[in-house]
Amino acid sequence: MMTEIIRKISKISTKNKEVFMKIINRILAFSMCAAMLFAMVLGTVGCSSAINAENLLEGITPSSVNGKQADEGFISSSADFAIKLFRQSVAGDKNSLISPLSVMLALAMTANGADGKTLQEMETVLGGGMSVDELNEYLYTYMKTLPSTDKAKVTLANSIWFRNEKGFVVENDFLQRNADYYNAPAYKAEFDSSTVDDINRWVSNNTDGMIDRIIDGDIDEDTMMYLINALVFDAEWAEIYEKRDIRDGIFTCYDGSENTVSMMSSSESLYIECGNAKGFIKQYAGGEYCFAALLPNEGVDILDYIDSLTGEGFVNAYNNAEYAEINAKLPKFSYDCSLSMNDALIAMGMPSAFLKADFSKMSNEDLFISQVLHKTFISVDERGTRAGAVTSVQINKESCPDGIIEITLDRPFVYAIVDNATGLPIFIGAVLGLGK
């Protein structure tokens, strides 16, 4: 193009050529300014993801540690934790969604700073009584072996943030263990508005923008530490729905209201039964993960059904899936949840962490868990599923049958995103209402 412009300039008279060249020079000058401005804008955008807080572990390579492959004991205790936490998190007639893995990772990091009765209770709730050392080894290997591909991405990130305050000492062994097993950077920060921005920026970056913040407003003056996990699941279906597969349908909500939804139809081949519910398994691309849906039988209340679920029952249902011909209908849906897990975890058996806690392996201060905040997001459509989760532990100082099976998810149902290698739910939720 530039060669053509030069050729045309050569045919212009000298006087006109001078005028023309002035115009060209102005255009070039304007273009250079625009390019510089564009580069500055890009630079500003790129820098917005930077963390201002000081990472005390930057440049330090985590120590080599031993891991353990998921076995029957780990799968059983993890499934038990997942279903108990799910049962405790369902409230009223609202949609729910949790990531048991995200909550477990954040609490396991926290448990590395616990001792005495506080540690015993956390070990019982998180690992069915296994030591935190064993749990670290299992989770270390599990995180590293979770498959992640272009069409079925799973990413995990952990971080620790603590207040830069005179006299507040965080134990080096606590930070080292969480760096070794959970690859968690340790940020020393002022806990002012810039720290709020840093933490929320970290959350957004590590959930692909699905969750943009975990802290609203100012940080309480008694808050000394945050231990945070972020998890992303983004996968295409093994067989993406075509336009012809999507039709309007009616979804009957828990409160009896009826709403029009986009219902996606497909033929599935894995049938599951779990207690008073039947459902299907739908694979994601690559076959490493699946979507499991459970529709309670007619006349069975969804909340009663959820209350009857057990970890053993869920894993057995998954493992005993049968081949069958299923006409499945799945509604498109998208929603987010924000839950405080305090009451759920206390009810599950770890009250000491929230009351008279012993976190002497974490710091020289008298500390306790003031809040376990869990935020999730999910979107299910014809392409696949996007889901994100963030768990923040806030630490304060004291102050198959015969024939074709029809399964239409047109009323409240339970679903899970499952790791096919272990049968463990990475996410588990319940849809009680959809529509406008």
Identify the role of each PLM range.
Residues D115, D307-E312:
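Residues that cap or delimit alpha-helices
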Residues K17-F191:
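Detector for small/aliphatic-rich hydrophobic stretches
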Residues I75-L85, T385-I404:
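Short, positively charged
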Residues N52, D93, V132-G299, D304, ...:
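Non-catalytic, conformational "gating/processing" segments within enzyme and secreted inhibitor domains
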Residues M1-F20:
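Short, Lys/Arg-enriched N-terminal segments with co-localized hydrophobic residues
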Residues G311-F314, L345:
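C-terminal, non-catalytic macromolecule-binding modules
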Residues L227, K278-L294, P401-K436:
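Extended hydrophobic
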